[in-house]
């Protein structure tokens, strides 16, 4: 009986196993094909039936063999046994022969002699199933595609109808300007910023502005006096965020900050309830012990001011209390530190903060979610919040194309950044951005919000963990305004859409209209040979179908294959503005728009646009002059924008001197439209060059046209004028949008001395002389001006200290 049951179970398993063919990876598509449906699956049912019959035969044989008389002569019993074995032997042998014929020979013969010669016709039904399922599983079934007949001839005034989009073109490259943030806003060597700052949007003076933003995190590697007390009880947190306009720079090429300084001042933190302290962040230390007895002096370092600095005591609920000896012993063992057990800094009010990375905290709360590779800060309702996107995934969606999420989300940013990563490598054929998570930078509290309420997977997890999730209605308007379309999901979708924009099974089979994401042309030749893809970019622009400019995530396509002729075939964007209403996602959020260029289009792709820049004699000459001195040229992200009836390429060019304390400054902007190239000190001027002398719209840096001197804000804000990090432990004067000094509680009076003002004026004049000499190619004068600049900056630093 046991043998029969096992045989029946195996047969049943074979029947149930046919469903695995629906997610089987084939050479062309995922899912069952003609041969699978017409040979493999029927054969499976036949073999299951044969196996069941065989089980019955064996069962009957076993029962019959037990009826042999035990008292019969041995010879008689042997003869009977031999006869009895004939039936099962023949049955098993027959089953093996039938199995070989049906499961091996028949599918192979069918595929080779019937399917392969007529593959396009015979596989079309199953390819169509794959197309439809893939689009549904990856959220591509509602893509708004349109033909975009792009011109390559730039005409005067062509951008007049795109004035708002033109004004918002982002100049600051989030991958390049982190060193600039550090030098101008780090304040002290024990603070740092992410190596790739975030792009977000904020309402500034009633106008939505693309913004580059970063949190000032703690970095103990920059602390001179390292010991257990300092590392774990004194230097416990970072302080504030720094934000700059994405589309504007100062005349000197520095970011134009609207939230800066320490203590933080600016447009984002004018609320009295603002909490700037950052105890939880991606770069936070392994653990900190916070809390002090009532009535005692605070010992946590808060921010630099005066000769000693301000102090603070943590007042939140961010970690376990370790006031009793047993808790101290446990954590001393966990972290391998006897100081936790014996230090007087550990008291009855002490808490220990650990697992401080926002992504790590969300993973602890919801380990079943796949988390986005980027965590970004936002100032929400007076607090700094880290926003983490969570995905539900599956590899069991019938007929949907399987994708390696890790490979699909790699690009030049993830390859070069320590703070942005691709998704963990795993196969999936269904993905939804079903969860938005926030982590409070002060107390580490984690809030999970159900974002995609139609996702059945997250509905199941809600039932398993009741009360773990907040509903959409609980998202405040301020938080909603910073919920953006996540990059990792978009990168997965753009990889699939490169093929699955094709809706016809016959066209899909031919593969003639397949696309690919271009490699990043700003990377080294070696990186381009490794097919390091161009990342998507957040931009505010107006695309086909949208009535006004929208904060969007964008990418582009070129033809698939290895052809050296790189033309643009498509422009992809998704509306990333979730609106600002409490509990309500903006109606256009998540709308994916695909602008397909005609097959005979000759609009250059990103790689060709970069080649056009490199081939321009004027551009090459000036860049070579810049690089021949003591400076390095860094080319920023190459942005693609559907403007002026065609595609505009914009690339900021940064210059960085070779000194150890130097930082990138935006000095030039490259623009291309068709084969026309513009190259100027400002984006506004470069656009005019490719559009007949007048583009018809003003860029964000239009006010800098004709102005090569440092502006008033930079002359007043010493931390954005000296370009160096103060490392002596004394207070830097913070900058703010009003150009005033402030935030000093120590020896500074808050006003600028005449000597300091003169030193800064001398620095500004030296920068002006440097620019003038550089344009003339007079490198002797340029060297003299740089020397004068260094002397003026050193004098300014000395006076400030």
What are these regions (language model features)?
Residues 1-732, 736-776, 780-783, 789-800:
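Soluble extracytoplasmic regions of secretory-pathway and membrane proteins
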């Amino acid at each position: 009986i046991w043998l029969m049951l096992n045989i029946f179970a195996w047969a049943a398993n074979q029947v149930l196993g046919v469903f695995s063919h629906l997610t089987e990876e084939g050479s062309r598509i995922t899912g069952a094909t003609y041969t699978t449906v017409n040979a493999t699956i029927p054969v499976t049912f036949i073999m299951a039936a044969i196996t069941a019959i065989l089980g019955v035969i064996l069962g009957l044989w076993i029962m019959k063999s037990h009826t042999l008389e035990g008292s019969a002569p041995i010879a008689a019993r042997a003869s009977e046994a031999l006869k009895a074995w004939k039936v099962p032997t023949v049955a098993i042998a027959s089953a093996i022969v039938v199995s070989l014929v049906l499961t091996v020979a028949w599918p192979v013969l069918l595929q080779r002699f019937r399917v392969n010669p007529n593959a396009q016709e015979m596989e079309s039904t199953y390819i169509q199933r794959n197309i439809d399922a893939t689009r549904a599983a990856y959220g591509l079934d509602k893509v708004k595609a349109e033909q975009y007949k792009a011109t390559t001839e730039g005409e005067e005034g062509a951008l007049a109808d795109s004035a708002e989009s033109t004004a918002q073109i982002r100049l600051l490259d989030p991958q390049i300007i982190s060193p600039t943030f550090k030098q101008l806003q780090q304040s002290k060597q024990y603070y740092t910023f992410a190596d790739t700052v975030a792009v977000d949007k904020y309402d500034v003076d009633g106008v939505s502005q693309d913004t580059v933003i970063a949190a000032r995190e703690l970095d103990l590697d920059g602390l001179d006096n390292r010991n257990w007390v300092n590392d774990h009880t004194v230097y416990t947190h970072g302080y504030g965020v720094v934000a700059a306009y994405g589309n504007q720079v100062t005349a000197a090429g520095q970011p134009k900050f609207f939230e800066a300084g320490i203590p933080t001042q600016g447009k984002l933190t004018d609320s009295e309830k603002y909490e700037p302290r950052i105890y939880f962040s991606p770069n936070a230390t392994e653990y900190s012990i916070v809390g002090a007895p009532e009535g005692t002096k605070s010992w946590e370092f808060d921010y630099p001011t005066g000769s000693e600095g301000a102090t603070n005591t943590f007042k939140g609920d961010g970690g376990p209390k370790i006031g009793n000896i047993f808790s101290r012993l446990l954590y001393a063992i966990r972290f391998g530190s006897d100081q936790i057990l014996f230090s007087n800094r550990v008291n009855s009010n002490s808490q220990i903060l650990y697992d401080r990375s926002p992504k790590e905290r969300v993973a602890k709360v919801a380990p079943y979610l796949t988390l986005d590779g980027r965590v970004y800060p936002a100032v929400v309702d007076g607090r700094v919040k880290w926003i983490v996107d969570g995905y539900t995934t599956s590899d069991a969606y019938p007929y949907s194309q399987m994708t390696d999420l890790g490979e699909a989300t790699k690009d030049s940013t993830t390859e070069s950044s320590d703070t942005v990563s691709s998704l963990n490598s795993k196969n999936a054929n269904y993905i939804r951005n079903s969860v938005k998570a926030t982590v409070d930078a002060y107390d580490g509290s984690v809030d999970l919000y159900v974002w995609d309420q139609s996702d059945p997977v997250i509905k199941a997890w809600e039932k398993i963990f009741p009360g773990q999730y907040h509903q959409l209605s609980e998202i405040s308007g301020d938080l909603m305004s910073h919920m953006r379309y996540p990059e990792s999901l978009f990168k997965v979708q753009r990889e699939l859409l490169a093929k699955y924009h094709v809706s016809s099974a016959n066209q899909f089979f031919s593969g003639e209209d397949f696309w690919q994401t271009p490699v990043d042309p700003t990377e080294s030749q070696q990186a381009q040979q490794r097919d390091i893809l161009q990342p998507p970019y957040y931009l505010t622009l107006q695309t086909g179908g949208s009535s006004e400019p929208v904060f969007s995530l964008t990418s582009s396509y070129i033809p698939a294959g290895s052809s050296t002729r790189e033309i643009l075939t498509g422009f992809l964007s998704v509306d990333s503005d979730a609106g600002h209403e409490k509990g309500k996602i903006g109606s256009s959020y998540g709308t994916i728009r695909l602008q397909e260029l005609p097959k005979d289009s000759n609009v250059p792709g990103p790689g060709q646009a970069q080649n056009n820049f490199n081939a321009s004699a004027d551009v090459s000459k000036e860049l070579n002059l810049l690089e021949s001195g003591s400076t390095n040229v860094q080319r920023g992200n190459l942005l693609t924008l559907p403007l002026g009836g065609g595609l505009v390429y914009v690339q900021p060019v940064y210059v960085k001197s070779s000194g150890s304390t130097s930082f990138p400054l935006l000095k030039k902007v490259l623009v291309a439209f068709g084969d026309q190239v513009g190259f100027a000190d400002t984006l506004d001027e470069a656009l005019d060059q490719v559009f007949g002398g007048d583009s018809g719209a003003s860029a964000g840096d239009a006010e800098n046209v004709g102005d090569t001197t440092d502006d008033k804000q930079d002359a007043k804000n010493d931390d954005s004028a000296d370009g160096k990090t103060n490392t002596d432990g004394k207070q830097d004067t913070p900058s703010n949008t009003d150009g005033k000094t402030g935030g000093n509680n120590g020896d500074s009076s808050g006003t600028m001395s005449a000597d300091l003002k003169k030193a800064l004026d001398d620095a500004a004049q030296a920068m002006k002389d440097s620019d003038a000499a550089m344009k003339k190619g007079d490198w002797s004068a340029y060297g003299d001006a740089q020397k004068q600049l260094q002397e003026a900056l050193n004098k300014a630093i000395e006076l400030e200290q």
